[in-house]
A protein has these predicted regions:
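C-terminal nucleotide
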Residues: 1-11, 18-21, 30-32, 38-81, ...
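Short active-site loop/helix that positions an aromatic residue
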Residues: 25
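Residues at or immediately flanking beta-strands
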Residues: 84-86
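Aspartate-rich (DDxxD/NDxxD/DxxxD) Mg2+/diphosphate-binding motifs
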Residues: 94
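Short, small-residue alpha-helix embedded
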Residues: 103-117, 285-290
Length: 325
């Protein structure tokens, strides 16, 4: 049996610039961290060696892997030449909530299957393989940031070059400032599910066709460099202001990113003591992330208590094999 554990990510700034239509023209960058909420993938030989069994939100039992409905499962197994396995996925957080879970699944599955075959795969290799699987084989349009975050783990600055290559730079901070940043980020669940690919496809088309949308995305990219600078100088209170400006621009880039209810929750959060925030992921559902100075947190939690809080810590490892037998 092989078990892999792959973290979910929290994107702080830059999302959208990792879309091919943008980074091929301008380059792109994202600053994100992974958290201690995970996707677990287990694999072991099926009792019936001629049968492949997949357990996720549903159960599939097939004799031929071409009959698998789940496109990532099917194409990864075909790519690795594997069948006759029983594979299960279990997640700490539901899909469609803006934490990059679909890419955490893909990264974790590729890592798991390589380990099953006793083949080593590095973090850059598994990230690139997941990008290829999602963007070129099953044709989703969710960019590159989620796969790299899931593979590498930690607080990183990801630079997406025009030629398609990706540079990964750890964001280095004093330990005390790093822990305070972790404390000052509060995540509230606002419910629902989204299809990130649909929102990102609209955003991608808007960036290409509308000058104001493209300029907005370029400004978000500039803010990502600003955020990197401020964090590396341990100025964590700058995070709130940058998140605030980032969200005000991002919500204009596609129709499905925000709605009046989300806008109302955001304004309430600011009035309750947050200095900035954003809806995580492509938008449309999931979690609001707020930056709240520690001295304002008691008031903030009291006034926002109708939205469930999900406590978290930063993850530092990325995708990992945690059990082999």
């Amino acid at each position: 049996m092989i078990i892999t554990r792959t973290p979910f990510r929290v994107s702080l700034c830059g999302g959208g610039s990792d879309i091919k239509s943008f980074y091929e023209k301008h380059g792109g960058c994202v600053l994100s961290t992974t958290i201690n909420k995970y996707m677990y993938i287990t694999s072991h030989p099926s009792f019936d060696k001629k049968t492949t069994v997949l357990k996720y939100s549903k159960t599939e039992t097939v004799q031929n892997i071409n009959d698998i409905e789940h496109n990532i499962f099917r194409e990864c197994l075909k790519q690795e030449g594997l069948e006759g396995l029983e594979i299960t996925s279990i997640a700490d957080v539901p899909s469609g909530t803006g934490l990059g879970s679909s890419s955490s699944f893909t990264v974790g599955l590729i890592k798991n299957l390589k380990c099953y075959k006793r083949e080593y795969i590095s973090k850059p290799e598994v990230a690139a393989a997941a990008c290829n699987m999602e963007n070129n084989i099953v044709h989703t349009t969710n960019g590159k940031q989620d796969q790299y975050a899931a593979a590498f783990g930690g607080l990183n600055f990801y630079k997406f070059n025009k030629d398609g290559s990706v540079d990964v730079e750890p964001v280095l901070m004093d330990h005390e400032a790093f822990k305070q940043l972790e404390k000052n980020l509060i995540m509230l669940y606002v419910g629902g599910e989204h299809k990130a690919s649909a929102i990102l496809e609209e955003q991608s088309k808007n960036i290409v066709s509308a000058t104001d949308k493209e300029e907005g995305q370029k400004r978000i990219m500039e803010m990502t460099y600003d955020l990197k600078y401020e964090l590396e100088h341990n100025n964590i209170d700058a995070v709130g202001k940058i998140l605030d400006e980032n969200w005000k621009i991002k919500r204009t880039l596609a129709s499905g990113i925000s709605n009046p209810q989300f806008d109302e929750w955001y304004e309430r959060g600011i009035k309750a003591g947050a200095t900035g925030g954003k809806l995580l992921g492509a938008g449309g559902s999931g979690f609001f992330l707020f930056y709240v100075p520690e001295e304002k947190q008691e008031k903030f939690r009291k006034e926002m208590n109708d939205l469930p809080e999900m406590e978290f810590k930063f993850d530092h490892q990325g995708t990992t094999v945690i059990f082999v037998n």
